[in-house]
């Protein structure tokens, strides 16, 4: 589970580096990341990849999804709509709409499209043995983020969003491990710990690592 780094804005959104890339370079870079996901993702696991379009390149998410599907072992299983509590209004634009929602794309291996794991519960079993499941909507209403960290990272999501996603795809068990390759300020880890599963994260920004570790220490202190 992760929120993809920028890549399509004129200015960097990380404290450590300028994350802007040309669209072709960005798509190739992302496909390479997904090929690495294929090496570490458990059987029938999922990749929850959050990103939205930008005013600079609104077509990029759709081009990126197509590039991933065409150049990796992954395909789209579902698209979750995340409705944020606040959004960019673009008051100076005569034609751009207010972006209230973002996407969370659910990627699975192509050969596991019929077997990937969720927490959908059986509602009944028919006389022929056919199982019927409680519906789970592809819509989440959640906070934007956990507070202002713009001086370090302008692209964060909320613990609220993380826990709602985990409720559908993860087990609240220590043995269930979530990996966030762009950990940032530690929101994925924070959500995992509150939900009850484990998390491994990587991050190149030393400052953000320190911030994330402090958040984790605070959770341990609170629960002791």
Where are the regions that the model predicts?
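Short, conserved SAM-binding/catalytic segment
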Residues: 213-224
